């Protein structure tokens, strides 16, 4: 059994590789003649192959012709070729006679294929068009000449009459038709003229020949499997008792199987219809021969040309068929566990993309420029945690109203001049300033004198009186140096006077400040371990007395800033006194003028 299966598989593979079959093999496989549509297709395709240019026969060489159906070869793609063989007949020597002989031999081969398997006493009935084509192809030019001679003889006898004239006209028409069909091109024209659209004749006849080739291969595969099954049954029959089914299968011969196959193909073509005629567009070409029954069935399935019947179980349609597909999908979704809400889902952070060169350049542009720190050489001495003091030395002034003295001498930082942006006061504030001015100056000093006189500065309270008493106690302990310190203290100006604010107006203060600065520097330089105790104690008391009273003349309070701003605003308002309307609007607050001044709060700002 395995051997038979292997052999059938090998036969199927070998037949799948077959590319051509002769017309005689096709007839032997079916054991019956071909149909008319297949005859038209074989004739047309064979004439198309014979129409190709061939070497012209030499007058002394024998002509070529088609002997039998075995000389007609069918190919898998629907082409048909002819194997030409030499003919000993040398009656015709021109090209037209050679074509006529070739057409005549083709007609004889086609007629034998149509008459295959019939007895000599039987004759197949053909359609008028096909019968006329076969007669003209087989008759050749001799038929027309004989008829022409017979008509001439009848004319010579001198018979006349209306009936005889009509018969002569019909004979002339048939004679003209018989004389015209002597070439392959004329046969192809006649084969194409029978179709509704002659232009589609090559495609239609090629499809018919291709279907004939494929059906023959399928039949041969089927017959080979039947043969293998018979052999297998014979082996089984030898081992087991004979059964009726095996006897019936044995009775069926090769011809019977072939007829059953042909009958099945016919029923598939004509009996089984999956489509309605009115739903299909009219196609004049007989498509039932262009495709195999299996290809027709697959084409109908692909195009959905069928109507499905309702499935009934126990007389009722099942519930799964009644329900809508959408409802089934919803039920399936509901049966699944509930999904997590989107708000509760936590997605991982997106991967950080590498920063492009353009973004890097923009980031560097947006960043502040880092300036290189510059250390200035300074011989200043750190004063520990003493209160904020302003340098009175002209050479070391860095325009700061408050200096941090807790920094060590080695790491002294460069001080920068602090500039404060003061906004212009409103009219209400200006009125309040005027009231305060009247209270401060009851004698009615004029505006110019107020502008020239500075505001007295208050004492810095960061250095308490208790610290001052302690310093004085230490100074009183040393009596020899006390007189010098007292003299130095007597020379010190009062803290609430106006001499420390504007140094440019009082040169004496400037000289004293420079001398004080020099005394401090000399005190630093003279502090060596080899000096005498008296000079050391004197310098120490001088230093303590110098810084007992912090820089009261250099500290600018808020009241002083307000006074300066008030003076500046009044000076600015004097510009608009000529325009009374504008001045009144400014005073009432209807018009606002933005006044901004940069005031340098330092001893050298003046």
Curated annotation (Swiss-Prot):
Stored InterPro entries: KIND_dom (IPR011019), Spire (IPR029901), WH2_dom (IPR003124)
Coiled coil (UniProt feature): none
Chain ranges of the KIND domain: 21-219
Ranges of residues in domain WH2: 263-277, 357-374
Keyword Membrane attributed: yes
PANTHER family registered for this protein in UniProt: PROTEIN SPIRE HOMOLOG 2, SPIRE
Free-text note regarding domains: Binds to actin monomers via the WH2 domain. The Spir-box targets binding to intracellular membrane structures.
Protein name per its UniProtKB record: Protein spire homolog 2
Source species: Danio rerio
Gene giving rise to this polypeptide: spire2
